[in-house]
């Protein structure tokens, strides 16, 4: 069981998953960043709740100074903006509803200058009970081959201890990770057939639909050929001393996407949520420089490149179908294909999941989230 402590200036209480007098409200919250970099926090409560929401801010997701809220809003307003000119230090927020119920939330995306698709996978609800993935524990991204000075500072501020590099050996040799502040664990999963498709693109021999077929074959191969490597990567998450962990590949969408999907599956996160996380790569990959490189290619080649650089739910769905066809269920794939035992799944849940809603009923100086 993982204990995360949030120190309170005022007296606090014992934590409960529910309310001693009636049902605890269901509180959903989301944090976004606008074009300037300000944080926009939105929430909904069910049932409808009146009263005051107090907002607290911290550089870490599990320790908040409660001496002074950074913002207030009527609960019915459903949103508040935290204005900042700090685009280096990542912020997390604690929402207090009537000084009784508390939710933590962070922005999904981490702003970077030279790293594609860096995201926090905290805040995803498990199917069972009042638990969600913890913020600031696991990140996913593209390769770290080029880092600005600010990017290095941002990664340092995330306190990344371990980077799981899923790129093939040839990719690593051409573009080694530049971040030196973490332990790099290389678990190579090669991109098969990339030389052939690159040659056909250059020679103008690519046909409409070739990119789609190539990506479908890639995702099937994750199940048929690369389960050993993905299973090895999952074992890294079993050691709590490895956290926070960053999983990456070239763009952070395919190999990192499949591994993240399997990890979330092991945590009993609903498949619909897993698919949304996977598809979010389309919103966090900057294709402008790649589009410039493809400007002189024919229409079919440009379309193929667009396909190769995106995420398509049919690809991950195809992998899930292959898993269920070959193994009968995702649970059996986790145990037989990825060699993850039920006890190890419980360990992952103890490390990564925590209470999504904190209920405070009696005064105390410390809140313990378990």
Show the residue positions of the predicted features.
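Short cysteine clusters
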Residues: 249
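Substrate/cofactor-recognition hotspot
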Residues: 252
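Single conserved hydrophobic/aromatic residue that forms the stacking wall/gate
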Residues: 358-370
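Cys-dependent protein tyrosine phosphatase-like superfamily
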Residues: 20-246, 259-357
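Bacterial N-terminal signal peptides
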Residues: 9-17
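Sec-dependent signal peptide recognition
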Residues: 3-9
């Amino acid at each position: 069981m993982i204990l995360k402590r949030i120190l309170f200036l005022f007296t606090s209480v014992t934590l409960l998953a529910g309310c001693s007098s009636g049902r605890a409200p269901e509180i959903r919250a989301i944090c976004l960043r606008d074009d300037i970099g300000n944080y926009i926090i939105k929430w909904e409560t069910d049932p409808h709740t009146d009263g005051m929401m107090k907002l607290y801010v911290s550089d870490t997701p599990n320790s908040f100074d409660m001496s002074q809220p950074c913002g207030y809003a009527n609960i019915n307003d459903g949103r508040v903006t935290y204005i900042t000119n700090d685009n280096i230090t990542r912020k997390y927020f604690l929402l207090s509803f009537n000084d009784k119920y508390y939710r933590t939330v962070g922005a999904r995306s981490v702003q970077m200058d030279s790293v594609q698709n860096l995201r926090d996978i905290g805040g995803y609800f498990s199917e069972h009970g009042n638990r969600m993935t913890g913020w600031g524990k696991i990140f996913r991204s593209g390769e770290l081959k080029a880092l600005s000075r600010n990017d290095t500072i941002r990664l340092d501020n995330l306190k990344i201890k371990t980077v799981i590099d899923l790129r093939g050996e040839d990719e690593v040799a051409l573009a080694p990770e530049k971040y030196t502040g973490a332990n790099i664990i290389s678990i190579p999963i090669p991109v098969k057939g990339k030389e052939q498709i690159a040659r056909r693109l250059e020679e103008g021999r690519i046909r409409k639909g070739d990119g789609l077929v190539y990506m479908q074959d890639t995702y099937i191969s994750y199940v048929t050929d690369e389960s050993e490597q993905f299973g090895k990567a999952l074992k890294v998450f079993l050691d709590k001393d490895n956290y926070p962990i960053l999983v990456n590949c070239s763009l952070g969408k395919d190999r990192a996407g499949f591994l993240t999907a399997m990890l979330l599956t092991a945590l009993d996160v609903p498949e619909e949520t897993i698919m949304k996380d996977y598809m979010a790569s389309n919103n966090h990959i900057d294709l402008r420089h790649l589009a410039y490189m493809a400007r002189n290619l024919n229409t079919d080649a440009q379309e193929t490149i667009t396909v190769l650089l995106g995420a398509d739910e049919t690809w991950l769905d195809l992998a899930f179908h292959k898993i269920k066809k070959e193994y009968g269920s995702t649970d059996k794939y986790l145990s037989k294909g990825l060699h993850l035992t039920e006890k190890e799944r419980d360990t992952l849940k103890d490390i990564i999941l925590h209470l999504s809603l904190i209920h405070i009923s009696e005064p105390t100086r410390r809140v313990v989230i378990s």
